Amino acid sequence: KKYKVIPVMIILLIAIIIIAKAVGAVYVPLLDTAKIIIKNLGIYNFTSISESQNSIIFLVRLPRVIVAVLVGAALAVSGAVMQGMFRNPMADPGILGVSSGAGLGAVTAIGLGLASRSIYFMPLFATIGALLAAWIVFILASSGKKIPVLTLILSGIAVSTFLGAITSLILSKISEYQVKEYLFWSVGGLSSRRWEHVNMVAIPIIICIILLISFARDLNVLLLGEEEAQSVGLNPSKTRKQLLFLVSVTTAMAVS
């Protein structure tokens, strides 16, 4: 049944991408939008497309849509993995402190004035902050070679609260313009996303998603319980650590 759903979802995604590219301050008909996509893919060269429309769709809107798709896919897969690991439909990557760590990294880059110098500084600082936050949570939650689920959740809440407090402190010290810049980033604004951002995150996110999907069978086994998992030769603790690391990297790249 799932193999029938996947093609339908892919078709819907393509349709949504075309519609999203057609919507904006400058109206571009859906047919022209589809023609521009086909033209830039090198399938067929439509001569009726104006250069201004081509620039609007290909250079401005398409990078934003692709970034949105990549980030959405990364967070969706990460969330599904977290829900499978914790056997809780409310679980999400945020319990690892990744979002708070990324926020602290971003506001640090803004406060130091680095975000305005290069588009790479804020994503870099946000990714480093997210991974450091996840690492601290792992260290606090580790008990020997095991990572108890309850301890992991409590450690994530504690680290998120602490990093959130530091972020608020920095926000109170920087300029109003820098605060607005951080707030725009924190709500997931895509208006300034360009092909450079796509090139920066596309390959890492796709690789991480493929690796996470490859753990689908192990996740299904973990849902049965630790004893059942061990009986079929699966090491629950090792598998959880690998999954948590991949989720942290995937989420860090997405939120940055």
Regions found by a protein language model. Give the residues of each.
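Alpha-helical transmembrane segments in inner-membrane proteins
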Residues: K1-S256
